[in-house]
Amino acid sequence: MKKRIAIVGAGYTGLTIGYRLSQAGFDVTIYEKENYAGGLASGFQLDGLPLEKIWHFLYMSDHDALGLAEELGVKKYLAFHDSSVSTYYDGKLFPFSTPLDLLRFKPLAFWNRIRTGLVALYLQRLKNWKPLTHVTALDWMTRRAGQQAAKVIWEPLLKGKFGEYHDKVIMSWLWARISIRTRSKENTGEKLGYFKGGFAVLTDRLKEEIEKSGGRLRLGSAVVSIVNKEGRGIDIKAGERSDTYDAVVATVPTGVFGELIKSNKEVGNAHVERLSAIDYIGAVAMVFTSDQKISPFYWHNINDPKIPFLVFLSNTVLTGEDVTGGKNVYYVGFYASHGHAYFSQDEDSVMSEWEKGIKDMFPGFDPSRIREKALFKFKHAQHIVDLGYEEKIPAYESVVPGVYLANFSQIYPDDRGINFAIQEGNKMALLIQKKFGSLQRTDGR
């Protein structure tokens, strides 16, 4: 008889686990509280275009994601495009893609530009990142790159990304961000990958393959508890329905996982508190189409506190108009703690405030030429990698027998992203197969 496996969460980690295990002969059911799959990379339609609710792309070094796309037959829809980066500071936009751009970056004194470049080169070549776990990114950059570079470049980016946690994030996290971008670059510069048809192309194929192998996706099913029935399987309760499985893999945020398993005898209050020790920050993203080409750059880092968001992206500049149907597609994003006003404000007021910010950056921007727009809010967008983080990382096998956890908090020192979600899914699928006797290896290796 097939072993019954439940997966909680239909993001890319959960979908990858479900795909691998259903291919290997397991009876798979995936629970997802939302009415859609894909997690943060989930798609929607705007102005007739398939888009993501928050910006996503692949690096050329994203081997797990590229391998899965090849395996599923959708790599033909993926193209890599030249990226272009700028930094907005003190009311001006500066190119920021190449070493030469850094040398021309006048907000820094000339020697500090040289110093910043040398620090970046050092980090790109650094292999032993372990010493960076004991110092915050802001402190390390202040000491190594200098106070001016820290104030102009790094502190605004950390504040925009982590808000109140900006001075707590450790340097090993920032090293990993710099490292992956270095690995993804060719001699011609950074290239980023995007699917024609959006990431829904990959999400839909995963869903199709899971269902073709007999797996089930229960969308709109919020799991409220996971309980080991002491020799009689693992019980999952979603709404008024309970089902029993041989094993359960949760792909939810770590603190949420603690709440789901807290009624098991192996889980005391201290363990729930330990799981909730990892803090998360949320994200708010606006997507809009316009008949205006606002900027020649794809990525805009906002290092100016007068602008009310962290990043501004022009997807059309990256992908070209053939992917976006001749329309200009833009993303505006901000990371915020759960108590931030953006999470309680109505969508129109947030978007109106951000449109004024875009107007401040680009005086020629005309909000009346926006064709369609949408706003999305995510409460668990990014885990906080702070001092002592290594001691907080949860194990893949929980203290409850037969219950497992796979999420972004375990990929340290790397940061979240589609490739790492798929990588974690591959790892967990192999772990489950080993526990129950592997039927076949299905990770393409």
Where does each model-flagged region fall?
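Active-site/ligand-binding neighborhood in enzyme catalytic cores
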Residues: 108, 118-229
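Conserved flavin/dinucleotide-binding core of flavoenzymes
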Residues: 315-317, 321-445
